[in-house]
Structures are given as structure tokens and as C-alpha cells.
């Protein structure tokens, strides 16, 4: 918590940014410090560690008061109608997010064991990524994960902010629990705080709705539960969790400029844009897809702002200046699009093939509304459709009455179009959805931001109707009237919110929430990566059997890929997939069992000092059997004189490879220069 929140919070407070905004936006700022700072440190050959991170944080914090002194405007009291809660209702306003967090966290914390690795494929890569950052002291996205793809070190651009943050609190042996704390505890806190902040800024005339936004998050098991617990998309989840706070800062900046008066308007805009820009850099560094998300949903809002600004300018300018401004704006938009399309990586994503057709149209449409797959049962489809359509219509009815809320509806529409593009072949929409791998779950998670706002507005309307019915009074449409309702009947509002928490939590079970929670429970068994807790203990303490920094080869789904996260042991393969670019790794994956007949096997083993082999029965993982994906690491004849048994636990065996002639002292496994070139003579472009 301190690493994620403290640097950003102190920096923003030195800029005199409001306390709540500083707390909500702090993670995004910290991510910017980590993301940009790690790149700078790596380019300067300075190691990434706690001391260098502390130095970077101090430098950023010291720069902030200098910036503040040179900008006359400060973030003081607002004229914007944010509708501060009355003192007597602060307990409700603070208590609801806390209650939501408890409901989110309690089931996962009860079920999970922080010391047992997640069974999902991505976490295995991330554990080893943190280990690589710790050992190489490199958290730059332009190199931190270079060693995380097997033997061959290949230039890799990969967001490593998540790994850099975990490395600041972890050590060899504590990578797994440190990763789980960030993924399962800190990310939900960032998410709920950010959504609460966005609610207060986006719904200035609807304090009841603003209070209910965090509550609405319980209706959606997709995030953070599914993405963090089931899928293990931790860097993506970290960036997404901080995104609502950045959006809230954008809305706050716009409101400050519009409602702050003419005095210091330019300075307010300048400083606000700077604060937002750092936040955007932070979430984009944590996961670049977030930048595309913000850009996509902002298209309608940007067009509206540009049109209004141009209209105002054209009215105040001579025709020639107006035309020049129009041309400049159009050129800027074209330049931004051209810059994005100039990247070959972006073009590859846009050109991804679409894996789906036009089957199950009704089920997909309902899932697009509910942001969760609801199955094909007609009764469930009808029920989910009625509930979601009714709630969305009521919420949008409120939105269209307030011009400053239009952006919520437009963002929801834009995200819905992306989801439909991921579900159906819709030409350009499907191409854009390729930036998110046509993965509807990633898009669902973003949609929760806007649906929570819309549903909170709908719930606020319903509470207003009930309050009116109970008091036989006029509906509370204005901000002051809604504030009066909260002030006069805090117990009523709090009770309704508490009841809503219970209802949403129970109703979410219709959406398979028990499945999400169940995935947090440790999995052991013959069909799992870890057969038993005894095998986990064996893997975690391999340095009791073999020398430290020994290198072990084995099927990553046998569990050996977890070894570096628990102790000073290195695994040849650190993720589920053995990549084609890893020529030497493919030789072992396909041919270790041919060690007697293929001289290349011993050549690779000797060159890198790979002295141990971890043997376990193959399992089917993610639909692929290990005996098919890495056939050379199974059915190995260990009685041929090349192997010596070191230890055995629950069917898993650790063998020392002793039969390769001409073994010499191996180079340092973490000297990446020795792993960039092929040791096979002659070099091979592929492995049969």
C-alpha cells in the first residue's frame, strides 16, 4: 500500500491537489514514476531497487513545489458544484466503499492461501518476471522481460510496472505472497477508491448516485475478481484499476476550467492537464492497452469539446483565423491517428483474424449488456435482458437531462460497440477490438466503469421515488434537494445502500460469482500443475537438495517453473509456452529424451550449465497435453546412464544430468549477453 500510494500522494499534495483526489490519483502517479523511472535508470546503467526508487520519488516530489511556485493557480476550493456531503452523512459516504471492499475481499482472502501459486497461465510468467527484475535490477519495459522466454534472450517490449512494484517489497522466496497482495488486495482498493472519486466528480448534481457507485461494482464479477483471480491478467488489472481516478481527474479539470471563472483559467487548465497527463502516462506504462481505451472512449467527448471551442472561437474571430484554427485541429487529430498507425505492433493487432461468427446472437447481445456471459437458457436470457435494459434505460433517462453527463452515455456506447466488434465480424469495429485480442472479458471490465455510473443514477432515481412515496413530497431532482434527503434521512439512504449491497451480492451469484471465488482456492491433484502440498514444499526447497543457482529443465506445467519464485533455483522455462525463437529451448523441449543420440542436447546443456531435470507426469493444461507440447521432456529414459536420481516426492523426481561428456564451468545464467546468440554449430533457424 505504501509503495503504491505514498509517492504519488505526497507529490500531488505538494501541488496542492485536493486530498481525496491525491489519494485516488496517487497509484497512477506512482506507476508513472515506476514506468518512466525504470526506463531512465536502465538507460543510465543504474539498478532498479528500493534505493533508486526512493531517489526517483524524492526527485519528483521536490519538483512539484517548484512547479507550483511557477504556476499562479493552485488547487484550492472549487466553484464547481461537487456537492460535498453534509457532515452527518460522511459516515455513510465513507462506510459504503469500505463495506464494498470487505464484501469483495473477504471471500477471496478466506479461500486463498497466499503462499500457493495461482494455477492460471499468466501468473507463472509474472512470478518469474518479478524474479528477473530482482536479479537483474532492470524494470524497464524495454528489457525487463528479455530473459523470461526460455534460454534464448530476445528483445522484448512488455509492460513491467507491475513487476517493478512487486520487486520493491518482495525478495527471493516471497515473490508469490507479495504478488498476491498486490493482485488480490491492493488492486481492489485502488479500484474502489478510484470509482468513488470518479463518482464525486462525474455526478456533481447527484450525491445519492455518487454514494451508490461503489456499491454497483458488486454487480459485476468480471472485475477485479475474474481478471485477477481467474485470468491472472495482473498488469492489465493494475492499469485498469487506476483508470477511473484518471477519468475523475479529467472531469475535475474540465469542471474547474468551466466553473472556476475567467481568473487564472489558463493556469488552472495548464496545471490540470499536467496532473492528468502524468496519470495517463502511469496507467499507459502499466499496460499500454489502457491508452487505447482512454483514446477510444474519449473520441465523442473530444469531438464535442472541439466543436464547441471552434464555434466559440469562430464567433469571436475573423474568418481567416477561424479557418486556420479548424485546419490545425484537424491536422492534430490526423497526426495522432498517423502516429498510432505507424507502429507495426498496432497494425498487427488491428489485422488480427476474427475467431467468431454470427452464432448465438441473442446470448452474445445479452452478455454485451450484462458484461458477463449469461449462458443460453432462455429464461436467464430474458431475465437478464429485462433487468439490465430497465436499469440502463432509467439511468440514461437521468443522463439525458444533464448535459454534463452526456459523456457517460457516449463512453458506454463506444465501449458497447467495441464489445460487439469482439463478438461479431463487424469490419472496422472488429479490427479495433483486435487491440484487445478480441477478448470480450477485457472489454467487459472497462465497461463496468460506465455501467456502474449509469446503474447508480438509476438506483438514485428509484430511491428518490421511494422517498417521495414515503414522505408524499416532491421528487428530489436538484443537487440541494438530494443533499437534503441525505441530510434528513441518512439512515434511510444508508439502509437502502446496505440492502442494495446484499441484493447485488446475492444476485451476482446468478452470474457464476461462486466460480470466480472458487478459483482463489489452492488447487492440488493429479490433473493440476501441483499434485500435492508436499510437491509444492519440494519445489520451494529445491536448494536443500542441489546447489543454489542450479538450472533445472522440465515441463513448465510440471511445477518446476514456480521454483525461481520460492528460492535461488533457476528454471529453463519460465512460462507455459516454449517459443519458436528459443532455438536451444526447443531442442531440449523436443529432444531431451534423445540425449543419447542427438549431440545438440548435450551441447546446449553444457553451454548453459543445465545440470538437472525435473520429471513429472504430463497433464492437460489449457486444452494442451504436456506430452504433445514438450514431448522431449516426457518419456525420458532415465536408466540410460545419463541421469542420477537426487530426490523424489509424490511421483515428481529430480535428476542430476551426469552423462554429457566435456562438461565445463557454466557461464552466469543471468549474463544475458551469453544467451543472445546461438551456441548450436552451425546455428539453426528452426528445430525439427
Outline where the language-model segments fall.
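Signature aromatic-anchored transmembrane alpha helix within multi-pass, membrane-resident enzymes
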Residues: 326-333, 462-512
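Extracytoplasmic
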Residues: 482, 507-688
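Membrane-interface helix-loop junctions at the exits of transmembrane helices
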Residues: 3, 34-36, 104-112, 136, ...
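Membrane-helix boundary/interfacial segments in multi-pass membrane proteins
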Residues: 44-51, 115-119, 225-238, 350-379, ...
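Active-site lumenal/periplasmic loops and adjacent helix-entry segments of GT-C-fold
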Residues: 100-241, 261-263, 519-522, 528-529
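Membrane-embedded, hydrophobic transmembrane alpha-helices
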Residues: 1-86
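Membrane-interface alpha helices of multi-pass inner-membrane proteins
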Residues: 39, 263-288
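Hydrophobic, aromatic-rich transmembrane alpha-helices
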Residues: 302-303, 383-408
Amino acid at each position: 500500500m505504501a509503495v503504491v500510494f505514498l509517492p504519488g500522494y505526497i507529490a500531488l499534495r505538494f501541488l496542492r491537489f485536493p486530498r481525496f483526489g491525491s489519494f485516488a490519483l496517487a497509484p497512477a502517479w506512482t506507476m508513472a514514476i515506476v514506468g518512466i523511472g525504470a526506463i531512465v535508470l536502465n538507460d543510465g546503467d543504474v539498478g532498479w531497487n528500493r534505493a533508486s526508487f526512493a531517489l526517483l520519488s524524492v526527485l519528483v516530489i521536490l519538483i512539484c513545489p517548484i512547479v507550483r511556485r511557477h504556476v499562479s493557480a493552485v488547487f484550492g476550493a472549487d466553484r464547481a458544484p461537487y456537492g460535498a456531503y453534509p457532515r452527518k452523512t460522511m459516515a455513510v459516504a465513507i462506510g459504503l466503499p469500505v463495506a464494498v471492499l470487505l464484501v469483495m475481499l473477504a471471500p477471496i482472502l478466506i479461500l486463498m492461501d497466499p503462499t500457493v501459486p495461482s494455477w492460471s497461465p499468466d501468473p507463472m510468467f509474472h512470478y518469474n518476471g518479478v524474479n528477473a527484475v530482482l536479479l537483474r535490477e532492470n524494470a524497464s519495459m524495454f528489457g525487463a522481460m528479455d530473459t523470461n522466454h526460455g534460454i534464448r534472450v530476445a528483445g522484448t517490449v512488455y509492460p513491467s510496472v507491475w513487476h517493478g512494484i512487486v520487486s520493491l517489497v518482495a525478495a527471493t522466496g516471497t515473490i508469490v505472497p507479495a504478488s498476491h497482495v498486490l493482485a488480490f488486495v491492493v488492486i481492489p482498493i485502488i479500484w474502489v477508491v478510484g470509482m468513488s472519486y470518479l463518482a464525486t466528480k462525474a455526478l456533481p448534481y447527484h450525491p445519492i448516485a455518487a454514494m451508490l457507485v461503489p456499491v454497483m461494482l458488486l454487480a459485476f464479477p468480471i472485475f477485479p475478481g475474474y481478471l485477477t483471480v481467474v485470468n491472472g491478467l495482473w498488469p492489465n488489472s493494475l492499469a485498469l484499476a487506476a483508470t477511473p481516478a484518471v477519468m475523475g481527474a479529467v472531469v475535475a479539470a474540465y469542471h474547474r476550467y468551466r466553473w472556476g471563472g475567467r481568473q487564472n483559467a489558463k493556469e488552472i487548465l495548464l496545471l490540470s492537464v499536467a496532473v492528468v497527463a502524468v496519470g495517463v502516462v502511469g496507467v499507459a506504462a502499466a499496460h499500454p492497452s489502457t491508452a487505447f481505451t482512454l483514446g477510444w472512449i474519449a473520441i465523442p467527448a473530444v469531438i464535442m469539446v472541439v466543436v464547441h471551442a471552434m464555434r466559440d472561437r469562430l464567433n469571436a474571430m475573423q474568418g481567416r483565423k477561424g479557418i486556420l484554427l479548424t485546419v490545425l485541429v484537424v491536422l492534430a487529430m490526423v497526426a495522432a491517428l498517423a502516429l498510432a498507425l505507424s507502429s507495426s505492433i498496432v497494425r498487427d493487432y488491428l489485422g488480427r483474424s476474427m475467431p467468431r461468427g454470427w452464432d448465438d446472437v441473442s446470448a452474445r447481445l445479452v452478455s454485451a449488456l450484462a458484461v458477463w456471459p449469461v449462458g443460453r437458457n432462455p429464461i436467464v436470457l430474458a431475465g437478464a435482458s429485462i433487468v439490465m435494459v430497465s436499469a440502463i434505460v432509467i439511468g440514461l433517462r437521468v443522463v439525458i437531462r444533464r448535459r454534463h453527463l452526456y459523456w457517460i452515455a457516449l463512453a458506454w456506447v463506444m465501449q458497447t460497440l467495441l464489445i460487439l466488434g469482439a463478438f461479431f465480424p463487424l469490419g472496422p469495429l472488429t479490427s479495433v477490438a483486435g487491440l484487445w485480442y478480441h477478448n470480450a472479458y477485457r472489454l467487459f471490465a472497462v465497461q463496468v466503469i460506465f455501467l456502474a455510473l449509469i446503474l447508480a443514477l438509476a438506483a438514485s432515481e428509484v430511491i428518490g421515488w421511494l422517498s417521495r412515496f414515503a414522505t408524499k413530497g416532491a421528487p428530489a431532482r436538484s443537487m440541494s434537494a438530494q443533499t437534503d434527503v441525505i441530510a434528513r434521512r441518512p439512515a434511510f439512504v444508508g439502509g437502502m445502500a446496505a440492502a442494495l449491497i446484499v441484493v447485488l451480492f446475492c444476485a451476482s451469484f446468478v452470474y457464476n460469482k461462486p466460480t470466480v471465488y472458487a478459483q482463489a482456492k489452492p488447487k492440488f491433484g493429479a490433473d493440476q500443475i501441483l499434485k500435492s502440498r508436499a510437491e509444492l514444499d519440494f519445489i520451494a526447497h529445491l536448494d536443500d537438495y542441489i546447489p543454489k543457482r542450479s538450472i533445472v529443465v522440465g515441463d513448465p506445467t510440471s511445477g518446476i517453473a514456480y521454483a525461481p519464485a520460492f528460492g535461488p533455483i533457476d528454471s529453463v522455462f519460465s512460462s507455459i509456452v516454449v517459443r519458436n525463437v528459443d532455438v536451444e529451448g526447443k531442442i531440449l523441449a523436443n529432444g531431451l529424451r534423445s540425449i543419447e543420440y542427438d549431440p545438440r542436447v548435450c551441447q546446449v546443456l553444457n553451454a548453459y550449465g543445465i545440470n538437472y531435470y525435473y520429471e513429472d507426469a504430463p497433464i492437460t493444461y489449457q486444452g494442451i497435453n504436456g506430452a504433445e507440447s514438450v514431448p522431449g521432456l516426457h518419456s525420458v529414459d532415465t536408466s540410460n546412464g545419463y541421469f542420477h536420481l537426487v530426490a523424489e516426492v509424490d511421483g515428481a523426481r529430480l535428476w542430476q544430468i551426469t552423462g554429457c561428456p566435456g562438461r565445463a564451468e557454466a557461464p552466469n545464467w543471468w549474463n544475458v549477453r551469453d544467451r543472445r546468440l546461438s551456441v548450436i554449430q552451425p546455428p539453426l533457424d528452426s528445430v525439427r
